[in-house]
């Protein structure tokens, strides 16, 4: 049975792939769960149209990610003031949300906190820390975040 996958199926393929499977697997598992559709000329043309649109969207997203990377790496100083103990240790920690707010406050673009990668799970000391922002699977921006003690 020839099918076109509509979802990612382990050990079989990705959405849009045309696969040949045994009749029982196709009829009893893939088709009822909506993981595949029966392959036909019309369905194949539709899949090709969807692939072209996805490729165009991927190129557009890559261009946008490169623009965001230039904007982030072009920021002169991204700093954050937090409460600290006398030894330079923070009360609490700096999270991805705090970093996203610091980027926006420094005049940078709005960044989703889930795309920010901290050097460790959280920043717990003052000083300069290198932060990575994953904007696209192929584009990562890096910048330095200065964490300072807040004036009490």
Swiss-Prot record:
Endpoints of the signal sequence: none
GO molecular function term, any single one: structural constituent of ribosome
GO cellular component terms, A-Z: ribonucleoprotein complex; ribosome
Pfam families (UniProt xref): Ribosomal_L9_C, Ribosomal_L9_N
BP-aspect Gene Ontology terms: translation
UniProt keyword annotations, A-Z: Ribonucleoprotein, Ribosomal protein, RNA-binding, rRNA-binding
Superkingdom of origin organism: Bacteria
HAMAP family (UniProt xref): Ribosomal_bL9
Record-stated family: Belongs to the bacterial ribosomal protein bL9 family.
Task performed by this protein: Binds to the 23S rRNA.
Descriptive protein name: Large ribosomal subunit protein bL9
Taxonomy of the source species: Bacteria, Bacillati, Actinomycetota, Actinomycetes, Mycobacteriales
Gene of this entry: rplI
């Amino acid at each position: 049975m020839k099918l076109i996958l509509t979802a990612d199926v382990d050990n079989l393929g990705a959405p849009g792939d045309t696969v040949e499977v045994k009749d029982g697997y196709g009829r009893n598992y893939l088709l009822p769960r909506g993981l595949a559709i029966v392959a036909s000329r019309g369905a194949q043309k539709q899949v090709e149209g969807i692939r072209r649109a996805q490729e165009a969207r991927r190129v557009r997203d890559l261009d946008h990610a490169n623009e965001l990377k230039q904007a982030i790496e072009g920021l002169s100083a991204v700093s954050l003031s937090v409460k600290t103990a006398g030894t330079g240790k923070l009360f609490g920690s700096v999270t991805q949300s705090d970093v996203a707010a610091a980027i926006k406050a420094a005049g940078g673009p709005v960044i989703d906190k889930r795309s920010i990668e901290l050097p460790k799970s959280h920043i717990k000391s003052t000083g300069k820390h290198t932060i990575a922002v994953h904007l696209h699977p192929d584009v990562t921006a890096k910048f330095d975040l200065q964490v300072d003690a807040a004036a009490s």
